[in-house]
Amino acid sequence: MKVEIDSFSGAKIYPGRGTLFVRGDSKIFRFQNSKSASLFKQRKNPRRIAWTVLFRKHHKKGITEEVAKKRSRKTVKAQRPITGASLDLIKERRSLKPEVRKANREEKLKANKEKKKAEKAARKAEKAKSAGTQSSKFSKQQAKGAFQKVAATSR
């Protein structure tokens, strides 16, 4: 014997009882009596109607067995060496004081700035040297030669 469950109230529907409602998207709703069918059609929320199973579950009514909470295993992060950095180096870097870390960072930034400045100066000097050897500047159009106008042909 197949016992169905009311889509609205959650009550049991025994064979030969209840009605079916098939929505346009072919979803089937079963109702135990006209009361739950009517409330469903009025678009009432079963969690707000005191006698439904959903309300009772939602508001923790009735006898409920104490379900032992499932203990989730906490993941522990394991530190592993990365390519180019050994485990000791990583631990050493992590244990550095913020002031020391800040000083190191500023030192590196200063060094990078100096390096960029030197590169820029070298590039500028090279550009000045190459500009001195060049005689006069030509545009691409001048280099190609003057545009030749095609003579118009007539019939």
UniProtKB/Swiss-Prot annotation:
Record-given protein name: Large ribosomal subunit protein eL24A
Pfam families: Ribosomal_L24e (PF01246)
Compositional bias segments (type: Basic and acidic residues): 89-129
Modified residues (Phosphoserine): S7
Polar residues bias: start-end ranges: 131-142
GO cellular-component term (any): cytosol
KW Oxidoreductase (keyword) present: no
Primary location: cytoplasm
Keyword Transcription among record annotations: no
Other observations noted: Present with 247000 molecules/cell in log phase SD medium. There are 2 genes for eL24 in yeast.
Segments for region (Disordered): 66-155
GO BP of this protein: cytoplasmic translation; translational elongation; translational initiation
Compartments reported by the entry: Cytoplasm
Domain of life the protein comes from: Eukaryota
Family (UniProt): Belongs to the eukaryotic ribosomal protein eL24 family.
Assembly with partners or alone: Component of the large ribosomal subunit (LSU). Mature yeast ribosomes consist of a small (40S) and a large (60S) subunit. The 40S small subunit contains 1 molecule of ribosomal RNA (18S rRNA) and 33 different proteins (encoded by 57 genes). The large 60S subunit contains 3 rRNA molecules (25S, 5.8S and 5S rRNA) and 46 different proteins (encoded by 81 genes).
Keywords: Cytoplasm, Phosphoprotein, Ribonucleoprotein, Ribosomal protein
InterPro entries referenced in this protein's UniProt entry, alphabetically: L24e/L24_sf (IPR038630), Ribosomal_eL24 (IPR056366), Ribosomal_eL24-rel_N (IPR000988), Ribosomal_eL24_CS (IPR023442)
Gene (UniProt): RPL24A
GO molecular function, one term: structural constituent of ribosome
PANTHER family assigned to the protein according to its UniProt record, in alphabetical order: 60S RIBOSOMAL PROTEIN L24 (PTHR10792), RIBOSOMAL PROTEIN L24 (PTHR10792:SF1)
Function: Component of the ribosome, a large ribonucleoprotein complex responsible for the synthesis of proteins in the cell. The small ribosomal subunit (SSU) binds messenger RNAs (mRNAs) and translates the encoded message by selecting cognate aminoacyl-transfer RNA (tRNA) molecules. The large subunit (LSU) contains the ribosomal catalytic site termed the peptidyl transferase center (PTC), which catalyzes the formation of peptide bonds, thereby polymerizing the amino acids delivered by tRNAs into a polypeptide chain.
